Amino acid sequence: MFPMVTGFINYGQQTIRAARYIGQSFIITLSHTNRLPVTIQYPYEKSIASERFRGRIHFEFDKCIACEVCVRVCPIDLPVVDWRLEKNIKKKQLLNYSIDFGFCIFCGNCVEYCPTNCLSMTEEYELSTYDRHELNYNQIALGRLPMSVIGDYTIQTVLNWTQIKIDKNKLLDSRTITNY
């Protein structure tokens, strides 16, 4: 009879432990009911890129001195810089500058080491095309600034309201490359 009593006691303890585990998991499940959804409806809602996001490269033709530092620091020698030497002023004249984003790894070395700051990273990350040759951007395409996600009224931006409270006017007045 003694082993039977200890068996009932063990069974009762296991039942109480199982009920406690189920209760704890149910409390965790209920704590998630008042949170915002994590997923977004992509084409209609976009998350705001962080300040140091490395998107498409923006190029300012007038600032470039054709020093080719960007080509030397690029791990895959990607930027193509065409220039000619002006003998009367003894300076390089930039003729053509292009980057093929089909091969670019968006490491940001070219932006960081540029002595004249003619290269900068933008928030643009939608570079998909049907033809890979369209990803080869010349100086005209690189010079276009992307439309800011924040300023576009057709797109609803997704902010994590529980962690960051951002004033929309403050975002529009900030001096980012996309708001010039």
Curated annotation (Swiss-Prot):
Signal peptide (residue range): none
Its EC number(s): 7.1.1.-
Keyword Transmembrane among UniProt keywords: no
SUPFAM superfamilies per the UniProt record, alphabetical: 4Fe-4S ferredoxins
Binding site for [4Fe-4S] cluster 1: 64, 67, 70, 114
Top-level division of the source organism's lineage: Eukaryota
Binding residue positions for [4Fe-4S] cluster 2: 74, 104, 107, 110
Annotated GO MF terms: 4 iron, 4 sulfur cluster binding; iron ion binding; NADH dehydrogenase (ubiquinone) activity; quinone binding
Cofactor note: Binds 2 [4Fe-4S] clusters per subunit.
Cofactor(s) listed in the protein's UniProt record: [4Fe-4S] cluster
Reactions catalysed, as given in the entry: a plastoquinone + NADH + (n+1) H(+)(in) = a plastoquinol + NAD(+) + n H(+)(out); a plastoquinone + NADPH + (n+1) H(+)(in) = a plastoquinol + NADP(+) + n H(+)(out)
Protein location: Plastid, Chloroplast thylakoid membrane
Domain annotation 4Fe-4S ferredoxin-type: ranges: 55-84, 95-124
CC terms in the record's Gene Ontology section: chloroplast thylakoid membrane
Assigned keywords, A-Z: 4Fe-4S, Chloroplast, Iron, Iron-sulfur, Membrane, Metal-binding, NAD, NADP, Plastid, Plastoquinone, Quinone, Repeat, Thylakoid, Translocase
UniProt cross-references to InterPro entries, sorted A to Z: 4Fe4S_Fe-S-bd, 4Fe4S_Fe_S_CS, NADH_quinone_OxRdtase_chainI, NDHI
Gene Ontology biological process terms from the UniProt entry: photosynthesis, light reaction
Function: NDH shuttles electrons from NAD(P)H:plastoquinone, via FMN and iron-sulfur (Fe-S) centers, to quinones in the photosynthetic chain and possibly in a chloroplast respiratory chain. The immediate electron acceptor for the enzyme in this species is believed to be plastoquinone. Couples the redox reaction to proton translocation, and thus conserves the redox energy in a proton gradient.
Family in the record: Belongs to the complex I 23 kDa subunit family.
Complex and partners: NDH is composed of at least 16 different subunits, 5 of which are encoded in the nucleus.
UniProt protein name: NAD(P)H-quinone oxidoreductase subunit I, chloroplastic
Name of the gene: ndhI
